[in-house]
Amino acid sequence: VGFKAGVKDYKLTYYTPDYETKDTDILAAFRVSPQPGVPPEEAGAAVAAESSTGTWTTVWTDGLTSLDRYKGRCYHIEPVAGEENQYIAYVAYPLDLFEEGSVTNMFTSIVGNVFGFKALRALRLEDLRIPTAYVKTFQGPPHGIQVERDKLNKYGRPLLGCTIKPKLGLSAKNYGRAVYECLRGGLDFTKDDENVNSQPFMRWRDRFVFCAEAIYKAQAETGEIKGHYLNATAGTCEEMMKRAIFARELGVPIVMHDYLTGGFTANTSLAHYCRDNGLLLHIHRAMHAVIDRQKNHGIHFRVLAKALRMSGGDHIHAGTVVGKLEGERDITLGFVDLLRDDFIEKDRSRGIYFTQDWVSLPGVLPVASGGIHVWHMPALTEIFGDDSVLQFGGGTLGHPWGNAPGAVANRVALEACVQARNEGRDLAREGNEIIREASKWSPELAAACEVWKEIKFEF
């Protein structure tokens, strides 16, 4: 008697092509590139095993539990068109394998160990289906799109932001001055750069105080609600919370966090604090390209975006689309919808492998940021629609007349695009014309159009 010791093929236990997925299963789509000679079924089963209950050999303690209840299952494998020896392996995980309300545990289980696996040349997590039963264990974004609009009293248009540059080296007072000029000119938000934390040339508390002063001055002057994303990211969770608490004491509307470098545990704690204390939370995705840039290894950004919506954030950076290829546009809009909408249909052309129901979890505003300027405004307005934040760093501060006129130019361009769209004009076709018309009655915009007329970021 006893049990049958020894090494056996994963696929005997973990490859179950006739498995019917349950509504409570977490489903994963992996792009698997097996080593030469490893059959795809074995590779897919190995992924299912190593990311759930399996280990490399049969163990005595397997008999003390019900593997059938707890094991991950590879239930479908399809070859990737146009790629040699590459497959999409679909894996179903029983819900009981995961701790409630912990993105950290979800990732530790699904991607924690299996990516270094010898039988695979490369492995990429393309998408996750989060079952409603699991979604309901997360708070999600502190406030969401609708509550944010109500807090800011801004409707029917995208919001405008600007990252303060030079990102490192300004003193706190000069930094606050730059913030004030941008907000006074017509932006809704300014932003700490992701690597502005608390350095010798500008300690966090000084920056917070001067930025708060800038916000209040600009609000008094413009009659609009303003914000500055105060970066609370720090070396310890305690220090991060200290910064968030100080921001709340100053009465500012929004703080910021780098969720990948800071980690999901810290991010979820901060998101809970933000909801309890009425702070909006802006999320920067520093480090994402380390994880998502390789096409055949790592984790696709749409998974990191889903994870952020569960962990909590009101804004997240999501790429700009402009000047890039058409295909990328569909993929980007796919995960932008995953961030904003309540229900998203499976659509492989947009990279969405599973239908996702968020069961009323609040939405996240996508942030378009990086290398954009006034000439991009029509395209951005058309692509992202109203529920987005458009961030022009150099596109504001690079204005020949300074920050405030740079902000004016962006605001005029945005209002012109929104008005044109509402009048039924085609932003994609008439975009340049709309900006040209608007620049006739805005010298600030005309100057911006001059500076950036030739710039294109196409490689």
Curated annotation (Swiss-Prot):
GO terms for biological process: photorespiration; reductive pentose-phosphate cycle. The active site is at K165, H284. Its main location: plastid. It comes from the Eukaryota. The keyword Disulfide bond applies. Substrate binds at N113, T163, K167, R285, H317, S369. The modification N6-carboxylysine is found at K191. PROSITE patterns: RUBISCO_LARGE (PS00157). Its EC number is 4.1.1.39. It catalyses: 2 (2R)-3-phosphoglycerate + 2 H(+) = D-ribulose 1,5-bisphosphate + CO2 + H2O; D-ribulose 1,5-bisphosphate + O2 = 2-phosphoglycolate + (2R)-3-phosphoglycerate + 2 H(+). The record marks K324 as: Transition state stabilizer. One of its GO terms (cellular component) is chloroplast. Its cofactor is Mg(2+). Binds 1 Mg(2+) ion per subunit. One of its GO terms (molecular function) is magnesium ion binding. Mg(2+) binds at K191, D193, E194. SUPFAM superfamilies: RuBisCo, C-terminal domain, RuBisCO, large subunit, small (N-terminal) domain. It is found in: Plastid, Chloroplast. RuBisCO catalyzes two reactions: the carboxylation of D-ribulose 1,5-bisphosphate, the primary event in carbon dioxide fixation, as well as the oxidative fragmentation of the pentose substrate in the photorespiration process. Both reactions occur simultaneously and in competition at the same active site. Heterohexadecamer of 8 large chains and 8 small chains; disulfide-linked. The disulfide link is formed within the large subunit homodimers. Belongs to the RuBisCO large chain family. Type I subfamily. This is Ribulose bisphosphate carboxylase large chain. The gene is rbcL.
